[in-house]
Swiss-Prot record:
Positions bearing carbohydrate: 70, 77
Protein name: Interferon
A Pfam family reported for this protein in Swiss-Prot or TrEMBL: Interferon
Major subcellular site: secreted
Length: 192
């Protein structure tokens, strides 16, 4: 006859519960560092974008709004969804603005400052997303991310088709400004 296992001491459950609670608390605290940065990221980034990319030396013809974007796909009140979407946008902005074909009239030191700011914020979001991923296995819809990916692919094609001209880059600068405003709205809607 098998001997029943000795009952687990209640303190053992308490230690396990305390360990799980501490891990969840540490993960939640890891995301708190975003809040002060949330308040200034968009404003500071918009200022750096304005400083780095003055208008082109010659007036640009009006483009037929290439790469339009339906921003209603960004509507969410879920903080994790907003963080994931913001992270995706920041990765694309970093990739497009860090390319070697940026116009000569852009101020490189300001561009580097903007890229550093984007990278720091993306890294903070990445850490927060990694921490929240260990707590939650919820899958988020891919539609907003596919739409964002298509939009940035269109911007890359637009630059290529226009030989990376100063006017094409000016259009990209205006789109980058719009994306930073989208990020501001995402953060404001989920952090207030």
């Amino acid at each position: 006859m098998a001997v029943p296992a000795s009952p687990q001491h209640p303190r053992g459950y308490g230690i396990l519960l305390l360990t799980l609670l501490m891990k969840a608390l540490a993960a939640a605290a890891a995301c708190n560092h975003l809040r002060p940065q949330d308040a200034t990221f968009s404003r500071d980034s918009l200022q750096l974008l304005r400083d780095m990319a003055p208008s082109p030396p010659q007036p640009c013809p009006q483009h037929n709004a290439p790469c339009s974007f339906n921003d209603t796909v960004l509507d969410t009140n879920n903080t994790q969804q907003a963080d994931k979407t913001t992270h995706n946008i920041l990765q694309h902005l970093f990739k497009i603005l860090s390319g070697p074909t940026t116009p000569a009239h852009w101020i490189d030191s300001q561009r580097q400052s903007l890229l550093n700011q984007i990278q720091r914020y993306a890294q903070h979001l990445e850490q927060c997303l990694a921490d929240s991923h260990t707590r939650s296995r919820t899958r988020w819809p891919h539609n907003p991310h596919l739409t964002i990916n298509k939009h940035f692919s269109c911007l890359h094609a637009f630059l290529h088709d226009n030989d990376y001209s100063a006017c094409a880059w000016d259009h990209v600068r205006l789109r980058a400004r719009a994306w930073l405003l989208h990020i501001h709205d995402l953060v404001r809607n989920t952090r207030t």
